[in-house]
Amino acid sequence: MSTSGKLTLITGPSGVGKGTLVNQLLERHPQIWLSVSATTRSPRQGEQDGINYFFHSRAGFEALVEQGGFLEWAEFAGNCYGTPRGPVEQQMAAGRPVLLEIELEGARQVRRSFPDGFQIFLAPPSFDELERRIRGRGTDSEDAIQRRLTRAREELEAQQEFDAVVINDDLESALNQVETLMGLG
């Protein structure tokens, strides 16, 4: 299967290693275009518009929602996040493989508007290992950790909705599986 002009989506619970896997994938396959999300939150130190996120006012974001400008969008912690439709469609039309790294609810929305997209669920080897990884970050309060774990349980229950499930036990092995699923040589 060729990934040329195809949409692939990767999702999975917080702490499963989506970001690490996607960064490695992009390093190995620079032809892949990673979608940049839009948000209403303020830029953090060092973040650039159009590189890290497309930064919008609440009104500007809502106008794009009304115009059907997002493949998916959601509100989280008081801010809106979404995947702009235009750039994704432009890259696909140009024949580039497109990759989205988004959360479960966004993946479900993309499936409705892009049923031909290939969806991969990245899963931990065990729930205990996922908890160890989340705690190992050392950045969250116990309350935040418990919220992440509760959400992770819900997300893991949804993995059968996806075209493929890849267990991220060993990064190299998981990368090889994703490359095979995406048809990358």
UniProtKB/Swiss-Prot annotation:
Pathway(s) annotated for this protein in UniProt: Purine metabolism
Enzyme class: transferase
Major localization listed first in the record, in broad terms: cytoplasm
ATP-binding keyword on record: yes
GO CC annotation: cytosol
Keyword annotations of the record: ATP-binding, Cytoplasm, Kinase, Nucleotide-binding, Transferase
Binding of ATP, residues: G12, P13, S14, G15, V16, G17, K18, G19
GO molecular-function terms, A-Z: ATP binding; guanylate kinase activity
A Pfam family hit: Guanylate_kin
InterPro entries given in the database record: GK/Ca_channel_bsu, Guanylate_kin-like_dom, Guanylate_kinase, Guanylate_kinase_CS, P-loop_NTPase
Catalysed reactions, as listed in the record: GMP + ATP = GDP + ADP; dZMP + ATP = dZDP + ADP
Keyword Cytoplasm recorded: yes
Function comment: Essential for recycling GMP and indirectly, cGMP.
Similarity annotation: Belongs to the guanylate kinase family.
Protein name: Guanylate kinase
